[in-house]
Amino acid sequence: MNAFDTDITEHADSSGCHPLFRDVPATVEFNKLRKRLLRLTRQAIEDFAMVKPGDRWMVCLSGGKDSYGLLALLLDLKWRGLLPVELLAVNLDQGQPNFPKHILPDFLTRYGIEHRIEYQDTYSIVTDKLPETSTYCSLCSRLRRGNLYRIAREEGCSAIVLGHHREDILETFFMNLFHGGRLAAMPPKLLNDEGDLMVFRPLAYAAEDDLEKFANAMQFPIIPCDLCGSQDGLQRNAMKAMLIDIEKRMPGRKDTMIRALTNVRPSHLLDRKLFDFAGLMANGEKGSDDALW
């Protein structure tokens, strides 16, 4: 039996739980939610072979609901003996005005979580280089990525772990489809260009709604993102609205879309680099009529 098929409760530590979970709601609803998120996180880690025992993971913590949820779920799995890696929580303070600098250090220290807070004023760089009418996402992302790679190397980490969830992956897929002219989403596992760091997204199967409910129940001290979240008209917002509308009219379509991303048939697409159409010819062997119907 695959270890990921067993009941979460079978792996609880003898001391009960990680300190982060000692005051959680004792309700059936929360227990189901927690177990579902743990199961989906474990499944993604297993499906995409993220774990190498003894590795050190740098868990990126922004102060938003998704990164809090990611950190909590990984700590929960580690506490239960299901994640044999070291965890380091890292926050990159990018210098946004009115950013509450005390919240994350206080939270991490309170629960005894190993962490590093790094200050780099990328906010000023972005706002100086771009006009107010521009969207900051691309430049901000490049600056953030460079700093995170540097910190991971300084801390001896083998992987950078991000809190992107199911909806992030689907939104990226449709952004690439509608605006980039390519079929691509966010990979759950990626090797950086230099070849020395992995990037993992263990929440690839987790629903954003579940992560929001989880964050509310856990009472995480959420920090809003004023730098990018306040800008209107972003392509991602349009994709998010489209997916919400589709799910409202046809419940369950998001799960179907995620399954589709795991079930690609290159022979039924038009990319000649992925499938040898030139070498496909009648030779008496059976083919497939699926694409005709």
From Swiss-Prot:
Binding site for [4Fe-4S] cluster: 137, 140, 228
Cofactor(s) needed by this chain: Mg(2+); [4Fe-4S] cluster
Sections of the chain in a coiled coil: none
Keyword check for Transport: no
Any GO MF annotation of the entry: sulfurtransferase activity
Gene Ontology annotations of biological process type: tRNA thio-modification
Classification via InterPro entries: Rossmann-like_a/b/a_fold (IPR014729), TilS/TtcA_N (IPR011063), tRNA_Cyd_32_2_STrfase (IPR012089), tRNA_thiolation_TtcA_Ctu1 (IPR035107)
Catalytic activity: cytidine(32) in tRNA + S-sulfanyl-L-cysteinyl-[cysteine desulfurase] + AH2 + ATP = 2-thiocytidine(32) in tRNA + L-cysteinyl-[cysteine desulfurase] + A + AMP + diphosphate + H(+)
GO cellular component, one term: cytoplasm
Predominant location: cytoplasm
Cofactor note: Binds 1 [4Fe-4S] cluster per subunit. The cluster is chelated by three Cys residues, the fourth Fe has a free coordination site that may bind a sulfur atom transferred from the persulfide of IscS.
Pfam families in UniProt: ATP_bind_3
EC assignment: 2.8.1.-
Keyword Phosphoprotein: no
Keywords, sorted A to Z: 4Fe-4S, ATP-binding, Cytoplasm, Iron, Iron-sulfur, Magnesium, Metal-binding, Nucleotide-binding, RNA-binding, Transferase, tRNA processing, tRNA-binding
Motif range (PP-loop motif): 62-67
Functional pathway: tRNA modification
Location of this chain's protein in the cell: Cytoplasm
Record SUPFAM superfamilies: Adenine nucleotide alpha hydrolases-like (SSF52402)
Family annotation (PANTHER family): AMINOTRAN_5 DOMAIN-CONTAINING PROTEIN, SULFURTRANSFERASE-RELATED
Function according to Swiss-Prot or TrEMBL: Catalyzes the ATP-dependent 2-thiolation of cytidine in position 32 of tRNA, to form 2-thiocytidine (s(2)C32). The sulfur atoms are provided by the cysteine/cysteine desulfurase (IscS) system.
Protein family according to the UniProt entry: Belongs to the TtcA family.
Subunit: Homodimer.
Note: The thiolation reaction likely consists of two steps: a first activation step by ATP to form an adenylated intermediate of the target base of tRNA, and a second nucleophilic substitution step of the sulfur (S) atom supplied by the hydrosulfide attached to the Fe-S cluster.
Protein name: tRNA-cytidine(32) 2-sulfurtransferase
